[in-house]
Every structure is written in C-alpha cells, then in structure tokens.
C-alpha cells in the first residue's frame, strides 16, 4: 500500500495489507461504544463483541508496529459507563505493556489563590470546552484517556520535545538544567479550537484536535519516526499532524463522508504552507485511494 494516503475501507482489512514491523507510531481513537451517532458504524455493540473486535484490531497493530514503536490510543467514557476506557486498556494489556497513562484535559478551572505568587497569572483561570452533564449525581467530564502502549515498556521518549517552561526560573540552575524546559507530565491540556459551525467544521462526533497526535509523535521522537498509522482516521487529524511534522502517514476510515472531509482538511492544510512545506517527504500527497 502507498503511504500518505487515507484508504476508505475497514481498518482490519487494510492493516492486513501492511508488512510486519513497518510502523513507528500508532495514534488513534476507536469508537468508544457509548452510543455516539456515527454515519455508518454502530456504536452500540454488546460489551463482549466490542472488546473482541478491539482485540482483533490490537493484534494487527502489534504485528505492523516496530519493536521500539509506540501505540497511543485515546479512549473516552461516560458517567453512566465509566469503565469502558479501562476495559479497553485491559484487553490491550494482553498484547502490550502500558508504559504511560496520559490525561487529555479539555477544560480546566484554577483559582488564583491555588496557583501561587506568579506575576504572569493575575486572576482565576477557566479555559477550554466541554459538554455539560445535566445531572445532580455526576460531574461534567473534562478529560479523556490516552494510553501509551509499547511492546516491552522500555521505549525511550523525547519528553522535552513537548516540554513546558519553568514558572520559577531559579529551578533551572537548582536542578542543573541546560534550558528552560521541564517534563510536561501526564496531564495534557489540549482544548478544541473554537468553531462557528460544528456541522461544517467538525462533522465527526468524536474527533481529537491535530495537536493531540502531534504531541504523541513528538513525545515518541520525530527524528526516529518515519511512518505513522491511524486505523480510525476519521476526518484526518492524525494526517494533518504528520504533515505539520514532515512525517509520512497511512490511515484507514470506513466512512466515505469522513474520508472526503479529511481530504478537504488536508488540502487546506497544505495550502497554508504557501508552497513552503519543504519538510513534507512525499510532495505528491493523495489522501484517498478508493471508496470500497
């Protein structure tokens, strides 16, 4: 199969056509099986059928992933079904080691008194987007999980590639650091971009922002990443992240409409470069191969 394409087909059939140990990083987000309304996919399988299906996908991912590769999987949950993310992780643990658990924070509120005495923070902070829960029992859900799996649990990461500056600059000298960056940790605040029309700008009901796969790839290490796979490409966020980083990608998406949206998003992303995107390895990028 050719790289830098999104194949509009079932990911199990697609991955079977990939060679063993050819992928450096997998970043994906499968259907959560929590009743989300997709165009073509039923998100209401029995728990047993859903987890069996997830395991078949995971087996193929393990086959195509290099021994020193990283597998990042984003899984959400609902207040009524809080265990689904852990059930998915428990299936994957049969085949991979859980190296890191990352919390994708979509919205956060911090009172000034809890921040400390920093001159650049002058008031309370409340930023991000979330879907409020109308309930007197459940809290609104502000985060999802990103499970980082590897084959052996010992893949070295480029933590400072997604590092953050020290608030207290005296820590740079105190900890004998070479620069003003520290480990971000496992809480990643990645808000959605503000949009005017969800139907036009974010038609997929459960997509992540391109910054999420971009950070996953950077954490694994851009220099050692040649090919990224997303088995559930959706509207192309992982492909966009790869284009921005100059890394080859391949993906699968069963829904024809989402494939076409992905194609348009990728075209717009390439136009933003104004012909100066010299780090794209394959300039002849074709996003769709065929509708099956």
UniProtKB/Swiss-Prot annotation:
Cleavable signal peptide: none
Gene Ontology biological process terms, A to Z: DNA restriction-modification system; methylation
SUPFAM superfamilies assigned to the protein according to its UniProt record, in alphabetical order: S-adenosyl-L-methionine-dependent methyltransferases (SSF53335)
EC number: 2.1.1.113
Keywords (A to Z) from UniProt: DNA-binding, Methyltransferase, Restriction system, S-adenosyl-L-methionine, Transferase
Domain of life: Archaea
Catalytic reactions of this protein: a 2'-deoxycytidine in DNA + S-adenosyl-L-methionine = an N(4)-methyl-2'-deoxycytidine in DNA + S-adenosyl-L-homocysteine + H(+)
GO MF: DNA binding; methyltransferase activity; N-methyltransferase activity; site-specific DNA-methyltransferase (cytosine-N4-specific) activity
Top EC class, one word: transferase
One Gene Ontology cellular component annotation held by this UniProt entry: cytoplasm
UniProt keyword S-adenosyl-L-methionine present: yes
Family of the protein in this entry: Belongs to the N(4)/N(6)-methyltransferase family. N(4) subfamily.
Protein name as annotated: Type II methyltransferase M.MjaV
Annotated organism of origin: Methanocaldococcus jannaschii (strain ATCC 43067 / DSM 2661 / JAL-1 / JCM 10045 / NBRC 100440) (Methanococcus jannaschii)
Gene: mjaVM
């Amino acid at each position: 199969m050719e790289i830098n394409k999104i194949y509009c087909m079932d990911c199990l059939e697609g991955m079977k056509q990939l060679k063993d140990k050819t992928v450096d990083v997998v970043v994906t987000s499968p259907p959560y099986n929590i009743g989300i309304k997709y165009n073509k996919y039923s998100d209401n399988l029995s728990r047993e059928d859903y987890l069996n299906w997830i395991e078949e996908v995971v087996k193929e991912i393990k086959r195509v992933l290099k021994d020193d590769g990283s597998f990042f999987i984003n899984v959400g949950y609902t207040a009524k079904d809080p265990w689904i993310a852990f059930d998915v992780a428990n299936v994957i643990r049969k085949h991979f080691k859980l190296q890191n658990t990352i919390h994708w924070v979509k919205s956060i509120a911090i009172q000034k008194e809890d921040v400390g005495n920093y001159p650049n923070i002058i008031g309370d902070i409340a930023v991000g987007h979330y879907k409020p829960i109308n309930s007197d029992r459940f809290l609104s859900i502000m985060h999802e999980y990103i499970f980082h799996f590897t084959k052996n649990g010992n893949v070295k990461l480029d933590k400072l590639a997604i590092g953050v500056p020290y608030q207290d600059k005296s820590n740079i000298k105190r900890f004998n650091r070479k620069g003003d960056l520290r480990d971000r940790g496992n809480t990643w605040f990645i808000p959605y971009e503000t949009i005017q029309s969800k139907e036009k700008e974010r038609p997929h009901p459960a997509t992540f922002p391109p910054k999420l796969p971009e950070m996953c790839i950077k954490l694994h290490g851009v220099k050692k990443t040649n090919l990224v796979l997303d088995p559930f490409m959706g509207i192309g966020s992982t492909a966009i992240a790869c284009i921005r980083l100059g890394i080859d990608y391949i993906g699968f998406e069963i829904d024809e409409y989402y494939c076409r949206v992905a194609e348009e998003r990728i075209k717009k992303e390439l136009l933003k470069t104004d012909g100066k995107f010299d780090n794209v390895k394959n300039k002849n990028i074709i996003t769709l191969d065929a509708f099956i």
